Amino acid sequence: MAKVKMKTNRTAAKRLKITATGKVKYTKGGVSHYNTKKSSKRKRQGRKPQYVPKNLEHKVKALLPNDV
């Protein structure tokens, strides 16, 4: 009988990317609308890519078994 493959979590695949060095990168949410009350600093920091902390990386990588 064939081995059952792990399915990729599509929610995670759409939001996260594994970099060449193995870090997990994502984009910060909450900067697309309702921006008038947010400071320039807060909006600027929202454009920068964010990285998943090292202690949670293994959990996230389990959701992305095929490195989507």
Curated annotation (Swiss-Prot):
Alphabetized SUPFAM superfamilies for the sequence: L35p-like (SSF143034)
Pfam families for this protein: Ribosomal_L35p
InterPro entries reported in the protein's UniProt record: Ribosomal_bL35, Ribosomal_bL35-like, Ribosomal_bL35_sf
Region called Disordered, residue ranges: 29-68
Compositional bias ranges of the Basic residues kind: 35-47
GO cellular component, one term: cytosolic large ribosomal subunit
Signal peptide (residue range): none
GO biological process, one term: translation
Family listed: Belongs to the bacterial ribosomal protein bL35 family.
Keywords recorded for this protein, A-Z: Ribonucleoprotein, Ribosomal protein
Gene3D superfamilies, per the entry: 4.10.410.60
A GO molecular-function descriptor: structural constituent of ribosome
Name of protein: Large ribosomal subunit protein bL35
HAMAP family xref list: Ribosomal_bL35
